[in-house]
Curated annotation (Swiss-Prot):
The chain crosses the membrane at residues 31-51, 86-106, 144-164, 187-207, 323-343. Required for formation of the rod structure in the basal body of the flagellar apparatus. Together with FliI and FliH, may constitute the export apparatus of flagellin. This is Flagellar biosynthetic protein FlhB. It is a multi-pass membrane protein. NCBIfam families: flhB. GO terms for cellular component: plasma membrane. It is found in: Cell inner membrane. The gene is flhB.
Length: 358
């Protein structure tokens, strides 16, 4: 039997399970673009500070070399240079780490997945490694990198060719003018490349999300199996509901002998009312239609409960009053008439009991 095609979108449960395993849609092009953007902005922000810092380091080197040129002093000097260079670059390194972290958070939210670091044989299996090397995902990633390099080179060459005509004019400028000319062209080139990398990152993000969705797609059978696991087998749930309805019905039927009257339609509706010292307002203790109405009337006859026909009241009680709830105020008068009928019937029955022995 051929394997069923995966045509269904992944469920929320499958996506959550994939997240717990560290499987999330992630575009390294987005991370790289935001990192590049942050790096360039950091250069503009810290450029003057770097110039001052590296100038001070240069003066310090010349001063130390002029005083002493021993092995120990040179080693100490290089240690100091490494320390000063690290401190100068530290703010940018921190910014790049924060941007890399946030660029991932923006793509797939906060995520803690310990399963990612768990050792798995499949990760070191050379056969799987070869398969992954020639997978569609790797081919697309490689193609995008090649396209990125080609487009960047082509764009740079195109922009540089536009500048060639201005080189003769720029050569006639003074040093300050040449620097300003070079700065404007450099900003133009950088802006163009950033726009290109932004477009490529956006395209890569769409591709990665589509690949992610396709990798998690499910067969129709998998969807059914997952539904059964989450919601339970529909047949079993139906049986449980039937049992619950049956138990509720049996409990309701047990309350009928405690009622004072059953109001009927007469055939389609039956509502049992209870009225005593504990219930100063009549309460609906049982109600039903059709077959259930017949059962209610049958139990009422078995226990000598009065059955009063009132079509309008029976329908209103069934429709508007919940089980074990008191009747609403607007039905007080109609229900009072019913209980008056019940009282009259009981009086007549008592008279018959008295007259009968005579």
């Amino acid at each position: 039997m051929a394997e069923e095609e995966k045509t269904e979108l992944p469920s929320a449960k499958k996506i959550q399970k994939a997240r717990e395993e560290g499987n999330v849609p992630k575009s390294m092009e987005v991370v790289g673009f935001l990192g590049l953007l942050a790096g360039l902005m950091s250069i503009f922000v810290f450029f003057i500070w770097w110039v001052d810092g590296f100038s001070e380091m240069y003066r310090h080197v010349l001063k130390d070399f002029s005083l002493d040129f021993s092995k120990e002093s040179v080693q100490e000097l290089f240690n100091q240079l490494a320390k000063d260079t690290f401190l100068l670059l530290l703010p940018v390194l921190i910014i790049l780490m924060v941007v890399a972290f946030l660029s991932n958070v923006l793509q797939f939210g906060w995520l803690f997945a310990p399963k990612v670091i768990e050792p798995k044989f499949s990760k070191i299996n050379p056969i799987n490694g070869v398969k992954n090397l020639f997978s569609l995902k790797k081919i697309l990633d490689g193609s995008l990198i090649t396209l990125k390099v080609f487009l960047a080179f082509f764009l740079g060459f195109f922009i540089f060719s536009l500048f060639l005509g201005e080189l003769n004019h720029a050569a006639l400028l003074n040093l300050q003018g040449q620097l300003l000319w070079f700065k404007s062209k450099a900003l133009w080139l950088i802006s163009s490349l950033l726009f290109l990398f932004f477009v490529l990152a956006f395209v890569d993000l769409i591709i990665k999300r589509r690949q992610y969705t396709n990798s998690l797609k499910m067969t129709k059978q998998e969807v059914k199996d997952e539904y059964k696991q989450q919601e339970g087998n529909p047949e079993i749930k139906a049986k449980i509901r039937q049992m619950m309805v049956k138990n509720a019905t049996n409990k309701m039927m047990q309350e009928i002998p405690k009622s004072n009257v059953v109001v009927t339609n007469p055939t389609h509706y039956a509502v049992a009312l209870k009225f005593d010292e504990e219930h100063p307002v009549p309460v609906v203790v049982a109600k039903g239609t059709d077959y259930l109405a017949i059962r209610i009337k049958g139990i009422a006859r078995e226990h000598d409960i009065e059955i009063i026909e009132n079509k309008t009241l029976a329908r209103e009680l069934y429709r508007d009053v919940k089980l074990n709830a008191t009747i609403p105020e607007e039905l007080f008068e109609a229900v009072a008439i019913v209980f008056a009928q019940v009282a009259k019937l009981e009086q007549e029955r008592q008279k018959q009991k008295i007259i009968k022995p005579l």
